[in-house]
Amino acid sequence: MTSTTKTDSAIDYENPWLCEGSTFTSDDIGDFFGFVYRITNLQTSKQYIGRKYFWAFRTPKGKKRKQKQESDWKKYYGSCPELKEDLKLYGKLQFKREIISLHTTKGQCNYEETRQLFINNVLTEATNDGTPAYYNSN
């Protein structure tokens, strides 16, 4: 009998992304181009919604054609300066990284990120004390 449960030895990066409650690894990428994600600060509950592509297309020195390679998605924590400051302050393990949805095209990924930003009211949502609920709000 074989098990499909991932063991700690199969997880090759710190604070792994979770997708539907399970750790997401390179083996899970398949035909997906990218994903929409939520990062939650476990100390303050402040969140960030964004998107990331699994693949980077770069032209190596001396070459004419772009080559496809896996991006830095495992280490990625968003592009927001305020979020980056809090990562330094609290440490990466104080943040939960969740994949909201997976997409097979760049266009689907971009569309779903925008849709999530609107349905979650990231520009206007605030906590009871008036603090923005999302890092995206600034």
Where are each of the predicted segments found?
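Structure-specific nucleic-acid interaction/processing domains
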Residues: 2-138
